[in-house]
Structure formats: structure tokens, C-alpha cells
Amino acid sequence: MAILKVDTISGIGTEGPVFEGDIEFTSQNFLTLPKGDTIQRGRGRGLIVANYIQPANYNTSEFITIQSMGNSIDFGDTSAAVRSHATLASSTRALSASGYVAPSNVNTIEFFTIATQSNSTDFGDLLGGSGSYAPISNETRGIFAGGYAYPATFNNIDFVTIATTGNSQDFGGMTTLRADGNRSAVNSSTRGLIAGGYISPTGTNNIEFVTIATTGNSQDFADLTAGRSNFTGLCSSTRGVFAGGTNPSNNIIDFVTIASAGNATDFGDMFTGNSVACCSTSNNTRGVIIGGDLQPADTFTNTMQHITIATTGDSLDFGDMLTTGAYRNATSDSHGGLS
């Protein structure tokens, strides 16, 4: 039973009720008021793009509702079966770029309309063709940093305007050339962090940052709690969280405050154990870590696990993907760069 008492309701039949003056809400349970316009209130979708199930790539994509635990649902397909690609998004459009399409790496960029289940559409091309880019985005701009195409490693950074199809443009370069791509990224609406990667003979703990709205080379930020590659990153508008990885394999979750340069701090552990090549997505409160290659058994999993970004602690079960797999990539319409 709910009781709503107001002095005046106006606009009936035209623009809906308008509440004027002081309004007081009393609830015996939890009360969350909506914010934003109608489209914004519908946000919260995580998109998981393509897949790798040893020994083959797949072009299938799936989606989840981040705030509601449960299994993934089929979304659509990329134009080619791909792995080690990079995905990023505005609140309406998701881009998937580069990656390995047998027998070589590609430089293609495709896009999905996040609210509509459908196949991808051609967007344009990156300046170079490689895999394992670190993706960064806000509502306007998408950035792809680094890249790896055996045996070559790249430190270039490209950018695109997400709302406008076309080829990428040069943004700058990364300060640290990592001997293997496989780095991760998190971002707010203004700053992007690029973390980890492989510098022989082990994973690096280096974190660099870029200012999204301006072009230029990356700058030193701080260090992860442990050097690693093949791991994932997710974020709220203030906090970036990194999970899993290899060199060596681990179940580490650590975090940084994006606006303040400083070393990462322990967050908790992944309940699945050591996970390599998992991916992740988030809204401003919840992060979801998806799939991966569990070590040392070398077993691909379809498990999804979640964390509350603002509070530390171990991950908890979220649901299952339709298929097992690793080397996917994921994004959302409500990640930290959009909040």
C-alpha cells in the first residue's frame, strides 16, 4: 500500500504530473528516486562482444542488465569471429575495434546500438592493425591505446568521435612500450588510465594516464599492487578496479582513485580463483567480471562475478554466460566515463 499526498497535480493529459514546492517521502523500506530523462533511466546494459573457445574465435555477442543478477542473453554478432579486440561505449553506441581474425590481426572498427539487439555495423578503421588495445571512452570520444601483433608491439594511441563514423586519428603515444599488448584500462569522464602489460620476463605494474579531451602522450600515474598482463579493468566515475591476469596468474582485485595519482590498493579476491583473459563491465556502482581461463587447470569458464565498486571485498556470483570463453571484451552504456 502506498499513499501519495500533494497539494496540486498539474499538467494532467499533457506533460504528466508536475510537483511544485517541498515534497517529503517516507518509506518503511528502500526508496530510490529516478534521475535523468526517460532514455537515461533505461540505461544499465552491459554488452559482451565476441568470444574465444579454444581453438576457435566466435562472433557471438551477449548482454546483461548490470544491476540485476542473472544469466546473459544473446545480443547479435560481429561481422567476423574475433578475439583480443577492444570495446568501448558512449551511453548509446558501443564500438568494437581490431583484434585477431584468423589468420591475422585486423584494423576494422564496428558499432552496435546498445539499446537494440542486432548485429554490428561498419564504423571505420584504426590507423594500424593489431590486437590487445586498451580502450577508454566518455560520452564523446573513444581512445584505443597500445596494441600487439606478434612479434611487434606498438605504443600509438588513436581516437575516434563515437557518434560519427570514420577512421581513427592520432592521439599521441604511450610512455612505456610493453613487450606484449594485453594491458587494461579504466577511466572517468575526463581521465583514462592504462595499466599493466608484459615486459619480458614478467608482467609490469606501470600505470599511465591521458586526458581524454586533449591529444598528447600519456604520463606516469603510479603502480599496480602486482605486475601482470591479460587482466581486466572496470570503473565508476571515481574509482578504477583491476582484476585477474597472468605473468604470473592470479585472482587479485586492486583499485585506484582515478583523479589522484597514487599506487593501487588491495580490493579483494576473485572467488573463481586465478583467472586469465577475463573481461568486465560496470555501471557507476557495480562491476561484473566475466569468463576467463582459470589457472592452473587451463579451463575456460562461463561464470560471471560481481563487486560493489565503492566498497572493498571479494567477488560474488552474478550468473552465467551462454557459453564458456576468454579473450572477449565488454563495455556498457553506464560505465564510469559516462556517469
Residue ranges of each PLM-predicted region?
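Polar, enzyme-active/binding microenvironments
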Residues: 2-339
